[in-house]
Amino acid sequence: MLAHHRKAMAAYYAKVGVTSFAPASMTLPYEVLEKALANARKLADESPAGLSVLRGIQMEGPYFSYKKRGAQNPDYLKAPDFEGFMALQEGCGGLIRIVDVAPELPGAEEFIRQAKDVCTVSVAHTDADYDHARMAFAAGATHLTHLYNAMPAIHHRNPGVIPAAAENPSVRAELICDGLHAHPAMVRFAFSIFGGARMVLVSDSGRCCGMPNGSKFELGGQDAWLVDGVARLADGTIACSATNLYDCMVNAIRFGVAEEDAVRAASFNPACAISAESLVGSIETGKVADFLVCSADYADRRVFMAGQEL
């Protein structure tokens, strides 16, 4: 991504009230990931005034199940590779704060045991059964990427990943709350089984977020289109979200999630997931003075960064 594209993205997020962000990478060759991470580091180091601050990266791929790859490019999937991961992590100055892995892949357990001392390890794009999921969490994974999506559904005789995560109090679960990736009833259900302290709202938005309907864009080396507010690949697969995190939070409240739980899931909990809670995520003495002043119905907001209104 070019420098002006990175800054345009950060400017858009700040405008809508997302004052910090942690973008996700895609399943790509290491040499491409290396360049993308270097670009992200430049933006994080620059931190231009008035732009949303890049606090970390979620490495979403390439250690994924082919069956549950979703919109990830299958040509670049590979088994967990700690040496390769560490080369990328060191190359970007430790900016990777979450690394995703499908625990049923060969070498996944050892990868998790090693990577947990480097950053948060998340179970993602997986066809794992209940036992493999429990193994992953016992080995040190403490996060579940976009709950419900790119993983087996809950079944009473084959519970799978979701119950394994829910019954482990150390595991947080992400949820894309755009009204498309999960039904409102399943949003309420997620908050009821994980609790407000363990839910992390995410936008999962691609570069199409904020773009006009009909826009064509690139996603992990694949063409995608924004049609009627939905981002899709050429074969119709949902590519990503086109909703920002503020709107995801408002959606959660409108879907029936307690206001305090939705706000926490869009602020403090994600800050904890990327080890940024000492800086952001809540209004406390010594933290960065980033906050929003919202109308009662959340239709309007005033955005403050470092104590200054944008």
Locate predicted features.
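Active-site mouth loops of central-metabolism enzymes
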Residues: 1-4, 25, 71-78, 120-124
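Divalent metal-dependent hydrolysis catalytic cores, especially in the metallo-beta-lactamase
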Residues: 7-36, 52-65, 92-104, 120-122, ...
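His/Asp/Glu-enriched, well-ordered alpha-helical/loop segment
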Residues: 163-173, 191-203, 209-293
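Charged helix-capping and loop-helix junction motifs
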Residues: 3-5, 36-40, 81-83, 156-162
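Short, electropositive alpha-helical surface patch
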Residues: 33-48, 111-120, 258-265
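Active-site gating loops and adjacent loop-to-helix segments of metal-dependent hydrolytic enzymes
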Residues: 11-22, 65-93, 135-147, 151, ...
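Active-site core of metal-dependent hydrolases
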Residues: 86, 90-212
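Glycine-centered positions in the ABC transporter ATPase nucleotide-binding domain
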Residues: 306-307
